[in-house]
Regions:
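Polybasic, lysine-rich low-complexity intrinsically disordered segments
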Residues: 7-8
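Phosphate/pyrophosphate-binding betaalpha-module
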Residues: 166-167, 171-233
Length: 237
């Protein structure tokens, strides 16, 4: 009977050990399955498919969404200009390299000093001649600046913004036109274009009225949508 008791006791011990092993295996499987589910959920949340369409930059930049991007580009400036109560504009075009007289003269003096040290330099001679030509055109910078100042003062007030100066937002004549409005404490618009080598916006545009475009055609549309006049200075294309 003692032997039978020992065998029964041993059997119970083995059953207990087996149950413990099974429970451990089940716990491991459960824990492992939880980890896999958590990883899978993170992958779901991080995937592009789970992003809101308007937050998915890869989607918005795709060829298939070109129409949507064009609609956004035509709509955004229009909403801003309406909000700012811009009734009409005057477009000012001209060369990006034309600068004010003092700046042109300073560059000439700099090259002249270099030429005195290297009088045979063809490169410096060509640069000197180009700068002399720019100096002869510097009066156009002042003309654009003065015109924009007068046009802005006579047509803008707290309630109405008509004949607002609009440029490409770059340097040269564009800068001069924006500068004239700036010096008159009036609004002016800059319509920049995104290109690899395109200029940085000049610092005289009214904050909130400088727009960056990707499409040339839509930029041109916004140039003419509110325009009542266009002023063309030398240079540019």
């Amino acid at each position: 009977s003692i032997t039978i008791f020992k065998k029964i006791n041993s059997l119970y011990v083995n059953i207990f050990i087996l149950e413990s092993m099974i429970n451990n295996i089940n716990d491991f499987k459960k824990h492992n399955n939880t980890d896999k589910r958590e990883k899978n959920l993170n992958l779901i949340l991080d995937s592009n498919s789970y992003k809101l369409a308007q937050e998915d930059l890869n989607l918005l930049r795709s060829d298939e969404m070109r129409g949507v991007r064009m609609l956004l580009e035509i709509t955004k400036p229009e909403l801003v200009l309406e909000e700012q109560n811009i009734i009409s504009t005057i477009i000012v075009f001209g060369g990006a390299k034309i600068v004010e007289e003092s700046s042109a003269q300073s560059k000439i003096d700099e090259v002249k000093n270099l030429l005195e040290k290297c009088p045979q330099s063809i490169k410096l001679k060509n640069k000197f001649n180009k700068l002399k030509n720019l100096l002869s055109m510097s009066h156009y910078y002042e003309s654009a600046r003065e015109f924009s100042k007068l046009a802005s003062i006579n047509n803008q007030d707290d309630k109405c913004n008509s004949h607002v100066i609009a440029t490409g937002g770059g340097p040269g004549i564009m800068e001069a036109a924006n500068r004239g409005a700036f010096e008159a404490d009036c609004k002016s618009i800059g319509l920049n274009i995104q290109l690899p080598n395109e200029q940085f916006p000049n610092s005289f545009i009214t904050p909130g009225l400088c727009f960056k475009f990707n499409y040339f055609a839509l930029r041109k549309i916004h140039f003419v949508m509110r325009s009542v006049a266009a002023i063309f200075f030398p240079g540019g294309f």
